[in-house]
Structures are given as structure tokens and as C-alpha cells.
Amino acid sequence: MPSIRAPLALTSFLLSLSGKPSTCVRSGLAANSRPWFGSIAGRNRVLANAPWWGGKAELSTDNSVVSGGKEENVDLKQYPPHLIRNFSIIAHVDHGKSTLADRLLELTGTIRKGHGQPQFLDKLQVERERGITVKAQTATMFYNYRSKKTGGANERFLLNLIDTPGHVDFSYEVSRSLAACQGVLLLVDAAQGVQAQTVANFYLAFESDLAIIPVINKIDQINADPEGVKSQLKQIFDIDPESVLLTSAKTGLGLENILPAVIERIPQPKGLVDASLRMLLLDSYYDEYRGVICHVAVVDGVLKRGDKIESAATRQSYEIMEVGILYPELTNTGILLTGQVGYVVTGMRSTKEARIGDTLFHTRSVVEPLPGFKPARHMVFAGVYPADGSDYEALSSAVERLTCNDASVSIAKETSGALGIGFRCGFLGLLHMDVFHQRLEQEHGAQVITTTPTVPYIFEYSDGSKLTIQNPAALPSNPKSRLVACYEPTVMATIITPSEYVGSLMTLCSERRGQQTEYSFIDGQRAMLKYRMPLREVVIDFYNELKSITSGYASFDYEEAPYQESDLVKLDILLNGQPVDALASICHRSKAHYVGRELCEKLKKVLDRQMFEVAIQAAIGAKVVARETLPALRKNVLAKCYGGDVSRKRKLLEKQKEGKKRMKRVGNVDIPQEAFHSLLKTGN
């Protein structure tokens, strides 16, 4: 009888069940490779022999050595405050923050090299598609370093890295991240140099009294000019060129100097180990299985699983069900000590309970709340409605789930005569609105219509009352009291541009009602302009115009400025004399005619023709400032006539004429959803 030879995979499987690691040499697998099957004991033995992160990655310099092994059991008690460094990476958009974060995680063995996912800390699909960071993310690393201060003794440091967004809309995420840090890496592109968001982020860190380590990235590029960038940093921020680090996150060049600089230049956390517990709540998101997961920074004291804690803002009490670090995924450690950053699970069922910037402390202890930080101020408002008017419940569910993970969006229910029931949402900026819309569609499958973005205005009346308007339809066209003054929000805009585009940009800013406050040259090729501008002029399409004029070379950033008095009017769009609330807008009187003409022309293109003539008008109160006429469809009522008396034809035509008059008098114009889609598309 011929012998039957068991397949190699089956042999490996049986060996693993017996608790012996499989060699699998003939199958092409390494002797200590990790099989996906087998008993727990066998799997543990295999893991002990060959760590999944790819073995040790020893990288040494004169005074430091990086340990390449990912710790199986993390004991946070081994890391007192003097062995902890909390730092963040801040930079302009696309200057390489997330790529540098990847290299540092690989360097310390936190993730394996070539993990198959570039920008590891960019978790959201929208972040990967757009190549931007939207949510700040935290990761803990461990690093062996021989410090001169300890006489060359090798010490293991705990480093908390926070990767922050670079876009102006998400500067709130940056400010939250900096609250948990003692220092930052200020990253600058070696080719592009200092940009607008570089300036804004530097002053955020400077005002927070953080240690700043300047790093010039992308020095491997052909057009890199590190010396030129050093001189820019010296001129704008008075940074010593000798303190600047040079690196390429893409190739790893100069990377070994960054973490030693973090340890040497950034101070340890200042908290007190023996004091009562105080934690700063940095961020929160909703998990379907564990409820709300909070990211926290322990300022004073110690937090352990089973502790009872209380919120300083809501005075609600919770029990710590799970506590740990992000290594880089959630890793349960059972404890967090002074100066450490991690996560807690408390059984909260809604992110509304987790107020960002709140102080958490042990129940029945008396502590002084931490300063926290200002709540996010919403700069742009827009209506969000279901594409299918009857699908409100599905939209409501999607919005509720998404806002669980994005607490910076404000939500209020509203009703529109044209679009049905929806929500009035407040956003940090246009990109934030775009990202919210995209996440609704991608993550929750909701098809929505987003109305034209508006900004919050203040209207003052003769009786002394003040009305803040976020939705133009809510402003009465004929108020009972006389309007005394109107105020609109403004921003302080910073533009950094090649000097040949300065004239064109000055013209653009003047057309947008901007007032110049500063004009200076950074070097021989680039200038910095500062303007105070109305926020409405910025949120419509200013950024696109700026990029178009400068061929994409200019960078733009803005920060909040006080309200200013302005000559504002409400512009209504009428169809056959009936106002369409979803198309109402508030604009400056000098631009009302232009805006009204543009809207009327667009409506004429997207509306279906009716059996009667449709008048499309733009009006300020009772005064019509623009008009377009949509001609009626003509039905051939004479088709059934084959000659004969002309009076018969005349009678049919007169009857049709009377019918059209009657239809025009009582007929309503239905605006199809497709028309709203094309008309209200952002940027139109």
C-alpha cells in the first residue's frame, strides 16, 4: 500500500497544537516565523523567538542607542517624570509632519518598518484621500538614551508624540495638543521655506511657553535650500541657525539626531507625583463597544483602574473601567502616572459628557481646576439637508454618530420650505465643512445637500435689541423696529507670497474689502502681507482665487479678529414673487447687485421650464435689484386643426392664453433636488 504523506501545512498545524513551534523550512517560511494558527502556548513561544515588528533595529550615535524591540508588558511605574517627554510636531500643510511621525515610530520599534500604511497616525479615510491630517493623534514610544547628565548611563525614556493638523481650519486641534506638551518640533520644508501656517503655529507654541526645536525637513530634494530657510527662521523668529536640525523624513537622513534633541532640549512634565489627581481631557471619540474613549494627560497624581473620578465641568462621577496608553493602538496598562498621556474608558455613553479641556479628579478630593482652553468658535454655518426630503431620520442618525467623533461641530435642527427638515451646522472653516460632508457620505452613506456657507452677523435695532443671525432666512425682511447698525466678523489674514505676485494680491484683497496692516519682505524673493478682512469674503472662494493668481505658490492663514460695523443687506430670491428661503443670503450693499445677478442667471440655467412664464428676481426688501425670465413652454393647441375657419384657431389660442394666466397666478414652481445640488455646491 503506498504511503500517504500529510501536507506540510497540516503537519505544521498538528505541531502547533502540541505546543511546539513549527519550523516550516521547506514551505519557504523562516524557522521562527509566526503562524496564524496553533495553540496559545505555541503561539507565545513563536512570538518570543521572533517579534512581529521584525527584530531589533539598533541605530546608534555617539551618545544614544535606540532599542528596536516593542515591549510586550509595559510597566509605567518605571517612568517617573524625569524620564518622560511630551512633544508635538507642528508645521504648515504638506511639510511632512505625518511622514516624520512614521519614521520616529519605526525608529523606536513602535511600528514595524514597511507596515504597509503610510501616515500611520492618519486614521480617517478622508485623511488618506486628501493627504491631510484632520484629527490630532497620539502615540507612545520608548527610547534608550545615554545622557551626559547621568554620566553616560543608559536610560529608557517614555516619549509621547502628538501629530497635529497643518490646515488653518484645524488650528483648534493644534491648540488642544499643545496643552499636553512641554515642547514642539517646528517642521519647515527645505524647498518651500517658512509659510503662513508655520508663522501661526510658532506663535501658538511661543505663547504657550513651550520649548521649540526647529527642524528643516525634505533636505534630499533637488531644490532644497536649508541655509536659506535657516536665515528665514532667524529673521522672522530670531531662531539661532546653530540650533536647527536637518533631516529627510522620506530617506531617514539626519533622523537619529531628533529624539536626542527632544530629550535634551524639552523639559520634563512639571506635575507633582504625590499630589491629588488632576487630569486634562484632551479629546474624545465614541466606540460602539466601549462607549466614549477619552484621551487624557495626567498633570498631578496617579490614576488606576477602578478609581472613582469626577468631572469639574459637569460634576458627574465615573468609575475607571480601563486605562492605558496608545502604543500605537490602545494598550491597557491599568495605570497612568504624573506626566503621562493616555486614554481612559469610564462608561460615558455620549461625547457631550466629555467636555474638551475639562479637569478630571478623584471623587471627594478638593483640587483647583486646570486652566483648560477656550471652546472652539464656529466661523462658518451651513444647512445640511437630506437629498431625498423624506430621509430625515437616516440623516439624523448619521449626523448624531458623526458628531460623537467630531465634537467641534455645532448642530441645531431647522426647517426649510424648499428643502424640508434638516440641520444648521457650525464649522471651524470651509475645509472642515467639506470634510464633514465627505465623512457623512463615506462613513455613514448619507446623501445630503449642503447650502451656501454663511457667517454669523449681528444686527442692532432702534429698541436696543441685538440679533445674531447664522441663517439668512431667519432675518426679517421688514422688521418692526428700525435697523440701527450691522456688524460682521473679520479675520486677520497672513499671506506669504513670491514678490512678483504682490501687486495682484493687493488688488484681490482690496476687491474683498481688505485693509492692509503690514507689508514686509522675508528675503529677496518672498513678501509677507497682513490684511484685516471680512470673514464672508474669505470663506466663499478667496483661497481658490489666491492660489490661481499665484500659481499655487502663496500660502494663507487667518486668525479671529473683532467684529466691525458694515453696510449689510438681506438679499431674497423670488420665484414668481414667492421667496425661496434656502437661497436667501446676507451681503454687503455694494455687492448686492452682482450677487443677485449671478444667482438669477444660475437659477435660469438649472430650473425646468414650466407651462407658464417664471420671473426669477433678486430683491432687497421691496426693491428688485436683478431679474431673469424663464420663458414658458408652448403647447401646440392647433395640432388637431386641419384648416377651416381661422376663428376656431383664434379661440383655442385665446383659451390657452387665459389658462397660462391662471396657472401663473396659482401655480407653484417646484425646484428639483438636482437644481439645488448644482446651485448650492460649495465654491459656486
UniProtKB/Swiss-Prot annotation:
Where it sits in the cell: the answer is: Mitochondrion inner membrane
Choose one Gene Ontology CC annotation of this protein and give it: mitochondrial inner membrane
Q: Name one GO biological process term.
A: positive regulation of translation
Pfam entry (one): GTP_EFTU
Family (UniProt): Belongs to the TRAFAC class translation factor GTPase superfamily. Classic translation factor GTPase family. LepA subfamily.
Question: Per its database record, what is this protein's job?
Answer: Promotes mitochondrial protein synthesis. May act as a fidelity factor of the translation reaction, by catalyzing a one-codon backward translocation of tRNAs on improperly translocated ribosomes. Binds to mitochondrial ribosomes in a GTP-dependent manner.
Recorded protein name is Translation factor GUF1 homolog, mitochondrial
